[in-house]
């Protein structure tokens, strides 16, 4: 069984019942961190991004989208960001496939609400993730749940496993935020609609075929 099929089979088996604490994620992380470009049929010199005019578009390649989880690739042109955004009631595993990315993370100071959409947050730090290590960034419902991804001077691709998936019917819609004031590590986050586009791309035959194959797994 390929490493991807191992991940999908395991995710279908244990999600969404798995506890959201980091310690219980080991069974997923141990497989997820081993996935490489070759497993996804990606030729690293041939990046998944396309020339664009404003530099504000990230390309989205779904691999599995079901009611339990989403597995997808986000491909960044150089010097491009996904603005600060949240993952309400969700856990996310993120791994860089090629290139490197900077991740600024935040947490709500008052996290008693599962559907909080504005207020004071604390900046929890910046991590640089790259393809030369096997580090997996773990985003939890109440820990580093709000973040911003920024690519550097090279193309970059990030593999994400999100569970449960975004779903507005269950108050899990993605909200983008803009800091309106900063006091040390404390920021006020207000929702806004950024000049940004995350575009689904169906032009890559290898990834399309992989999407079809993986979506059949139970």
UniProtKB/Swiss-Prot annotation:
Required cofactor(s): Fe cation
UniProt KW Aminoacyl-tRNA synthetase keyword: no
Enzyme class, broadest EC rank: oxidoreductase
Please name one Pfam family that this protein belongs to: PCO_ADO
Q: Which UniProt keywords apply?
A: Dioxygenase, Iron, Metal-binding, Oxidoreductase
The source's superkingdom equals Eukaryota
Any GO molecular function: metal ion binding
This enzyme's EC code(s):
1.13.11.19
Q: Which PANTHER family match?
A: 2-AMINOETHANETHIOL DIOXYGENASE
This chain belongs to the protein called Probable 2-aminoethanethiol dioxygenase
Q: What is the lineage of its organism?
A: Eukaryota, Amoebozoa, Evosea, Eumycetozoa, Dictyostelia
